[in-house]
Amino acid sequence: MRSRLTPQRITVHSRSVLLEAAAQVIRFSLAAWVGGTLVVVLAAPLLFGEIGSRDLAGRIFGELLRRFEAVKHVLSLAIVLATFAELETTRSLEGRRFVAGAAAFVAIATNVYLAMVVRPRLAYFRMKVGSFDETPPENPWRVRFNRLHRRSTVILMIGWISAAVALAARPN
């Protein structure tokens, strides 16, 4: 005897529950992204100002960034899945929802670029520099590191602003 799976009907009530759940997941994920980035931005000057060794401060802050990027990967997945659930339910991406979706896409793209391209290059340059406490500022590897570090800071800010725009643009 074969068992049959009967398709379940999606009711108006279940659609509204799914839509609300997706919206809450997106709001929470974007709020965590924006708040977490604020903590990281505030922690950097504190760590580098209070810890005497740039090498030690860099190792601590680098690990903080690595862990936060892992959190942002999970948040990115939640945002994407919840956005797909919204699209499946509403069948549209217009107005504020489009702005929020586009901004969330930019935020996610910045995180992927930082994690997959920039951070590995920074790690390589850091390895080539050796010690930031002992290597002179004009060292070519340190110059490359500093240039890429400035770019990574700008990209982080773009992602932060994009996540904030996505959060603010979300329809109520």
Regions found by a protein language model. Give the residues of each.
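Mid-bilayer segments of alpha-helical transmembrane spans in multi-pass integral membrane proteins
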Residues: F105-R121
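Interfacial loop at the N-terminal end of multi-pass membrane proteins
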Residues: R2-L5, I10, S14-F98, Y124-R142
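Individual transmembrane alpha-helices with interfacial aromatic-anchor signatures
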Residues: L64, P140-G159
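Alpha-helical transmembrane bundles and membrane-interface segments of multipass inner-membrane proteins
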Residues: A100-G101, T110, L114, S162-V165
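Physicochemical signature of membrane-embedded alpha-helices that form the seven-helix bundle of GPCRs
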Residues: V25, S29-A32, A103-V106, R151-I155
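Juxtamembrane boundary at the C-terminal end of a transmembrane helix
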Residues: A166-N172
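Hydrophobic cores of alpha-helical transmembrane segments in multi-pass inner/ER membrane proteins
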Residues: L77-I79, G159-A163
